[in-house]
């Protein structure tokens, strides 16, 4: 046999072995999890159709009409369910101080206790901490939480609930901006809250901090007066991209005495002010929301204002607020967008709120129940609805964080129990 023929023969054998290795590797499951046959709603990627979603290494690996189940180690049947990016709630209160000052009010909740069961993977604490106590908030709340916790930093240095909401001496734009620049991974903007006057120091300092740090401001507008009104707020004070939360509260003349929508709301939208729900304990009423919808004025984003005084009233949780927006007439894709891609853009986190390939696999699997339901506003007034959103499963970084009906679990009869001391028989004791 000639040398050239021998080399050729060896090359062909090597190629054959290589092909076998590649074939064997391709036959092995390489996705960690496959969500099969769910209806994907992803506003960023303009998907509103049945798709399979594959997850690998905690990230979205593929979104396609058909993915072979043999490629995944675990397959979840999502047929009849909606698969969306993990929900984003940009108005919550989750800061329990490690050393609260005397007389401080504490209405915050544990983020992990109320996020995943509602499909929420990211929350934004809306001003519970200020520049003076942000380090405590970061160390004791943000770091240990499994939920992604971000923050609007209160322009009041001592934060919310400490009795300083109306103390202009506590409002330091430079200090707030400095803390924001030092913590860009957590702080997404500034919060002005509950200020009752006189003047505009809370708004002005929050906006100044926003300009210094290049970040938006969220406003929970306090007491209105002849001088302090939403006309001035929207036309003279806030910037495009700033957020007016509690947009259907009625406390700031969002509707007029004749029941019609205040034209200032429309003018604010023209200036690209963001209008956020912020349901809360006393900030969402049908008598405001219905005229707004009749005028074609819809919210930009849906949030809860989650705290101990709101969670058991009309608000309940984010998917309940989303169900209320369905009852008002918004179609499901819009409602999903208002709780995913829209808030992600508002807080300038484009890596969130979508199912981009390579994105962290924060995912909600939702069921839309059909029937006769009642949605309550903050006064307890009821509006009938025919659809209600239920969270079946939540994934955080590709790991199951909530599974209402065990979609990702084995049947107990085939489940391999790891029997520890608790399972020892009497004979072994």
Kindly give the residue locations of the regions a language model identified.
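N-terminal signal peptide c-region/cleavage motif recognized by signal peptidases
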Residues: 22-24
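Histidine-rich, glycine-flanked metal-binding segment
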Residues: 29-33, 40-86
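C-terminal cap of metal-dependent C-N hydrolases
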Residues: 38, 360-414
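Divalent metal-coordination and catalytic microenvironments
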Residues: 38, 58, 80, 91, ...
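Metal-associated gating/positioning segment near the N- to mid-region
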Residues: 69, 73, 77-143
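Divalent-metal coordination cores built from histidine and acidic residues
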Residues: 109-194
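Active-site core of metal-dependent hydrolases
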Residues: 189-312
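His/Asp/Glu-enriched, well-ordered alpha-helical/loop segment
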Residues: 287-370
């Amino acid at each position: 046999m000639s040398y050239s023929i021998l080399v050729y023969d060896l090359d062909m054998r090597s190629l054959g072995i290589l092909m076998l290795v590649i074939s064997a590797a391709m036959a092995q499951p390489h996705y960690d999890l496959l969500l099969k046959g769910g209806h994907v709603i992803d506003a960023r990627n303009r998907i509103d159709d049945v798709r399979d979603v594959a997850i690998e290494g905690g990230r979205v690996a593929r979104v396609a009409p058909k993915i072979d189940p043999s490629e995944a180690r675990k397959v979840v049947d999502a047929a009849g369910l909606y698969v969306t990016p993990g929900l984003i709630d940009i108005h919550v209160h989750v800061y329990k101080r490690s050393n609260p000052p005397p007389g401080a009010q504490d209405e915050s909740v544990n983020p992990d206790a109320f996020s995943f069961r509602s499909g929420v993977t990211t929350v934004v604490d809306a001003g519970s901490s200020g520049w003076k106590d942000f380090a405590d908030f970061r160390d004791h709340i943000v770091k240990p939480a499994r939920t992604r916790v971000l923050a609007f930093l209160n322009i009041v240095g001592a934060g919310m609930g400490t009795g300083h909401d109306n103390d202009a001496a506590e409002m330091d734009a430079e200090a707030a901006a400095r803390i924001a620049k030092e913590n860009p991974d957590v702080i997404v903007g500034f919060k002005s809250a509950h200020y009752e006057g006189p003047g505009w120091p809370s708004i002005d300092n929050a906006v100044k901090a926003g300009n210094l740090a290049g970040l938006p401001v969220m406003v929970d507008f306090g007491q209105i007066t002849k001088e302090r009104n939403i006309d001035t707020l929207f036309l003279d004070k806030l910037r495009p991209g700033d957020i007016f939360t509690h947009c259907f509260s009625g406390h700031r003349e969002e509707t007029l005495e004749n029941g019609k929508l205040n034209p200032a709301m429309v003018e604010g939208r023209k200036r690209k002010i963001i209008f956020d729900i912020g349901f809360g304990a006393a900030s969402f009423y049908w008598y405001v929301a219905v005229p707004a919808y009749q005028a074609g004025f819809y919210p930009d984003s849906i949030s809860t204002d989650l705290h101990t005084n709101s969670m058991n009233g009309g608000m309940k949780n984010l998917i309940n607020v989303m169900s209320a927006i369905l009852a008002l007439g918004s179609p499901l894709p819009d409602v999903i967008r208002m709780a995913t891609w829209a808030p992600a853009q508002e807080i300038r986190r484009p890596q969130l709120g979508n199912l981009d390939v390579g994105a962290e696999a924060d995912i909600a699997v939702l069921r839309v129940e059909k029937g006769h339901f009642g949605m309550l506003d903050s006064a307890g007034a009821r509006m009938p609805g025919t659809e209600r959103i239920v969270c079946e499963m939540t994934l955080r970084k590709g790991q199951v964080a909530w599974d209402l009906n065990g979609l990702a679990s084995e049947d107990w009869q085939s489940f391999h129990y790891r029997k520890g001391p608790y399972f020892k028989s009497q004979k072994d004791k």
